[in-house]
């Protein structure tokens, strides 16, 4: 029986690798910010504080700042401070300051409490943040238009990956049975909720490192997305796939509403957020005072999406499942005569598509912190547009469409009125449907198609 285990195994192996790794590759930006805010309270009023170096402190759960103090009189003075915190990684208490050591001695417990209680979270403290220092020294200078465009391209990377995976989920099902499952956005929300639950389980078990929490979150999201998609798709798609397209379309609309309400009741209307991770900007280029940068979390999100897309394409072109899928999509009767079980193939396809949707939801949580019970609808609609734009029956075309739609949204928001972005996007969809109904990599036939 041709199944769909290869990409799931690849994603699971990646998640286990992340789970086994317990180290961070950057200083926690939130903890570094809190430590910087504490510095003005440790020095003379009116002094200018310039951060020279930020690095992990000794023993974990700490940040060390080397800084220079320039007062109104006297030469500049160099100091250091080590801020210790209650937790690290994905723990909710990682922003709780519990100790401060300096080159002039440690602060007492009462001083740390007063600093945390009345200064760190106050407006005065936020305004006194000296900033991360000049990290742009030595960067390559480029023209300002080039720098601005490069920044927008970097900003679009996570969005293109998320849209691409969701669009591929649409393409997997439509390419096999010519049916659109409108519930993939909600399946992404299911995956996001499962990922948050996985992170909570990891932190509850004592694994607060981001890689460990996200690894378990990815496993939970893959399992939940595949399970919900396979079970729900059996009733909303598989059992009525032999009928006309309208009953299946209506059934998936009902499935979308059901999943949305189910999530609202299961996790409450309040969106659960995970703490920000890997959010310290890495400077790359500069144009005068404008610095082009990217956050490590954006690189992780886009990298995981690219790896999942590569695993999916490899599976579709080189595995037994991919050959069976392409054979059944071309001619179901001939594929059945060759030994392909259409029902089991559709079940595997639904599970694989749900896993891709669940992974997309995990990437939303990783990049933006959370995804509410109603947030999947708009996400799924944009991904459907991406699938149509790239060629809804083509997995590769859907991935290309996700890249195109993500880049289009980002660049339009950067150069044109943002309130007209969705209008322009839907107008572009109409143009594609009129002049190239098969999409970029789909059929060129402009004739009527079953939808």
Q: Regions from the language model: what does each represent?
A:
Residues 170, 205-255, 262, 400-405, ...:
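Alpha-helical transmembrane segments within multi-pass membrane transporters and channels
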Residues 290-371, 395-400:
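Helix-loop-helix "hairpin" substructures at the membrane interface of multi-pass membrane proteins
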Residues 240, 245-318, 348, 411, ...:
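Transmembrane helix-bundle core of multi-pass membrane transporters
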Residues 106-120, 130-166, 194, 206-217, ...:
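Membrane-interfacial amphipathic/re-entrant helices at transmembrane-helix boundaries
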Residues 144-162, 315-320, 349-387, 412-423:
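Inter-helical junctions in multi-pass inner-membrane proteins, predominant
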Residues 135-136, 145-148, 266, 270, ...:
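Cytosolic-side transmembrane-helix boundaries in multi-pass membrane proteins
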Residues 186-190, 239-264, 375-388, 404, ...:
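Pore- or pathway-lining transmembrane helices of multi-pass membrane proteins that form conduits
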Residues 149-200, 231, 235-247, 389-395:
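Single transmembrane alpha-helix segments in multi-pass membrane proteins
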């Amino acid at each position: 029986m041709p199944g769909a285990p290869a990409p799931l195994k690849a994603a699971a192996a990646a998640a286990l690798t992340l789970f086994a790794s317990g180290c961070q590759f950057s200083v926690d930006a939130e903890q570094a910010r809190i430590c910087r805010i504490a510095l003005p309270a440790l020095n003379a009023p009116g002094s200018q504080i310039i951060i020279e170096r930020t690095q992990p402190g000794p023993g974990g759960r700490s940040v060390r700042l080397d800084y220079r103090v320039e007062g109104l009189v006297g030469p500049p003075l160099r100091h250091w401070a080590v801020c210790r915190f209650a937790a690290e990684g994905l723990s909710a208490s990682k922003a709780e300051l519990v100790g401060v050591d300096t080159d002039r001695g440690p602060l007492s417990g009462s001083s740390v409490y007063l600093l945390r209680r009345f200064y760190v979270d106050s407006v005065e403290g936020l305004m006194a943040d000296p900033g991360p220092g000049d990290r742009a020294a030595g960067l390559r200078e480029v023209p300002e238009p080039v720098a601005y465009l490069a920044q927008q391209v970097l900003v679009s990377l996570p969005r293109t990956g998320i849209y691409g995976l969701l669009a591929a989920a649409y393409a997997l099902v439509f390419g096999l049975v010519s049916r659109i499952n409108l519930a993939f956005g909600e399946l992404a929300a299911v995956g996001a909720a499962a990922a948050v639950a996985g992170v909570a389980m990891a932190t509850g078990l004592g694994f607060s490192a981001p890689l460990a929490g996200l690894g378990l979150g990815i496993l939970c999201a893959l399992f939940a997305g595949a399970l919900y998609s396979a079970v729900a798709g059996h009733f909303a798609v598989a059992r009525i796939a032999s009928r006309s397209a309208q009953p299946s379309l209506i059934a998936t609309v009902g499935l979308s509403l059901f999943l949305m309400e189910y999530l609202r009741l299961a996790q409450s209307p309040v969106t659960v957020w995970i703490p920000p991770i890997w959010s310290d900007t890495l400077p790359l280029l500069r144009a005068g005072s404008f610095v082009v940068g990217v956050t490590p979390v954006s690189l992780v999100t886009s990298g995981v999406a690219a790896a999942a897309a590569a695993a999916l394409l490899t599976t579709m072109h080189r595995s037994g499942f991919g050959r069976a899928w392409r054979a059944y999509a071309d001619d179901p009767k001939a594929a059945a005569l060759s030994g392909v079980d259409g029902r089991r193939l559709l079940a595997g396809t639904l599970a694989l598509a749900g896993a891709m949707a669940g992974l997309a939801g995990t990437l939303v949580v990783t990049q933006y912190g959370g995804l509410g019970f109603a947030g999947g609808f708009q996400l799924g609609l944009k991904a459907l547009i991406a699938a149509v734009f790239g060629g809804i029956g083509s997995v590769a075309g859907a991935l290309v469409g996700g890249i195109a739609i993500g880049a289009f949204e980002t660049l339009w928001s950067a150069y044109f009125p943002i309130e007209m972005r969705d209008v322009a996007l839907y107008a572009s969809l109409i143009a594609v449907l009129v002049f190239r109904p098969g999409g970029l990599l789909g059929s060129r036939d402009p004739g009527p198609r079953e939808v």
